[in-house]
Amino acid sequence: RTSAYQMSIMQHALPYFANQTVMDVGAGNGILSLFALQAGAKLVFAVEASTMVEHLHHLVRAAHAQDGDSVPNMWTRDRLAVVHARVEDVTPGMLREAAPIPVEPRVDTIVSECLGVLLVHERMCETLLEARDRFLKPDGAVFPRVGILCFSLLNDTRMWQEVRARGEWWNTTDFYGIDLTP
């Protein structure tokens, strides 16, 4: 999945990423933010609610720690703005404050790995739509812009028994001498 995102971002670099302001919604470890920067984004807002955001803060600090050619990820310097918050809680002021350069709090492109189980498991689609409605410029783009669900009927008794057995695990009275029953 990661390579598919990288390929899509690089293939669409000129119209949607090069010299553009980008928001990575639910940035997680920041890989899509970094891909957007590799594709030439002027600035990326990496918005993440979890503590995974600390890794991105570390990358930003490391890029600013010293000068010279040997600085790791020097190409991210003054181009990556980390926002530790849920998109629903982000304000334009928070974006302005996080940005290393003066910028309006509207973005040209939104990117997100919003793919939970069947697209909806992690409820990121709603968050992505919230970001689109609040922060995307009228002529902006969203990646991915389409999600397709495909279904097929399947009857696999063995798989069903395995899944059911996992649920029954909590009813074990002697798991290495431990009673797991409530």
For each feature predicted by the language model, list its residue ranges.
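Class I SAM-binding transferase module
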Residues: 1-2, 6-25, 32-182
